[in-house]
Swiss-Prot record:
<dbReference type="GO" id="GO:0032259">
    <property type="term" value="P:methylation"/>
</dbReference>
<dbReference type="GO" id="GO:0044027">
    <property type="term" value="P:negative regulation of gene expression via chromosomal CpG island methylation"/>
</dbReference>
<dbReference type="GO" id="GO:0008047">
    <property type="term" value="F:enzyme activator activity"/>
</dbReference>
<dbReference type="InterPro" id="IPR040552">
    <property type="entry name" value="DNMT3_ADD_GATA1-like"/>
</dbReference>
<dbReference type="GO" id="GO:0000794">
    <property type="term" value="C:condensed nuclear chromosome"/>
</dbReference>
<keyword id="KW-0744">Spermatogenesis</keyword>
<keyword id="KW-0539">Nucleus</keyword>
<feature type="domain" description="ADD">
    <location>
        <begin position="41"/>
        <end position="173"/>
    </location>
</feature>
<keyword id="KW-0863">Zinc-finger</keyword>
<dbReference type="GO" id="GO:0141005">
    <property type="term" value="P:transposable element silencing by heterochromatin formation"/>
</dbReference>
<dbReference type="GO" id="GO:0045892">
    <property type="term" value="P:negative regulation of DNA-templated transcription"/>
</dbReference>
<dbReference type="GO" id="GO:0044726">
    <property type="term" value="P:epigenetic programing of female pronucleus"/>
</dbReference>
<dbReference type="InterPro" id="IPR025766">
    <property type="entry name" value="ADD"/>
</dbReference>
<dbReference type="GO" id="GO:0005634">
    <property type="term" value="C:nucleus"/>
</dbReference>
<dbReference type="GO" id="GO:0019899">
    <property type="term" value="F:enzyme binding"/>
</dbReference>
<dbReference type="GO" id="GO:0000792">
    <property type="term" value="C:heterochromatin"/>
</dbReference>
<dbReference type="GO" id="GO:0007283">
    <property type="term" value="P:spermatogenesis"/>
</dbReference>
Amino acid sequence: MAAIPALDPEAEPSMDVILVGSSELSSSVSPGTGRDLIAYEVKANQRNIEDICICCGSLQVHTQHPLFEGGICAPCKDKFLDALFLYDDDGYQSYCSICCSGETLLICGNPDCTRCYCFECVDSLVGPGTSGKVHAMSNWVCYLCLPSSRSGLLQRRRKWRSQLKAFYDRESENPLEMFETVPVWRRQPVRVLSLFEDIKKELTSLGFLESGSDPGQLKHVVDVTDTVRKDVEEWGPFDLVYGATPPLGHTCDRPPSWYLFQFHRLLQYARPKPGSPRPFFWMFVDNLVLNKEDLDVASRFLEMEPVTIPDVHGGSLQNAVRVWSNIPAIRSRHWALVSEEELSLLAQNKQSSKLAAKWPTKLVKNCFLPLREYFKYFSTELTSSL
């Protein structure tokens, strides 16, 4: 995905910085199109950059960009909300942190940062040819990590984390409030309550757990029948509560809805007190065993509709799960659309299969990656042990 070269572990630890002066930016003597217009409008026409969409160059500004000074139009706003917290398998964000698109991306070399920037945004906002200079660097630090807040026309907003939260809460259609992202120096290891299914392997492969981690960092409970509020409070506090129904074909003496009700009960015990600013996340996964009535109850209890995450190989639907969660990007439109008919047929096929039932945790594994914006992680390279 990214064009920045891999960091050399033997090299001296240093960060390269490019600062661009106004003379470099004023090279646009005549207006171009799209993003090429931005520098011309600001330098030649003295237009306030807040009146220009810094994602595409449109003058039809809907609101202000949350991370950098400048406007953002309605279509780019929707794209930004939909893609900001999406991650690739390499652990870095899938799209440019400015425009939330871009084909060739430059990766920040700060090991605590997962952000990327497209060539087009860097050249139009920082200065022509800057992307090539960045690409040639051994270890480049990005515009949200630099000590200096300005690079060319790109000016980092003050308190951009709170600006991002306000932007998301105001503009997103998601009924749940977004938690403000946490600065690196304040991030703590995530504490997890894993119900029914053990997700230790997934969290370890993502770098959230390491060998020798505090045993209390992950609490796995299979039978929660006798678990009461006092137990959860003594085990906690928790930052993430995860639960799932058994997979199709799994022998179980309890109805599928039991897992939903028990998850919801323990979720209430684990929640921080009302008004607490502490980031708190949860996820419940249905492995296609809940019937329509159960699904309606789940959506009412969890206060949202589920998102279907499919596993498609060679154009064929191999597996799928339904997910309810308040983790950012779970509700992204980038998830492939799967019809209820396809899910019903898949469930029937898996139910009649004689293969051993497996927990399809790999389908939701990458859904945890946005938590890197909130909690400490111990590895910058994802392992593919699943």
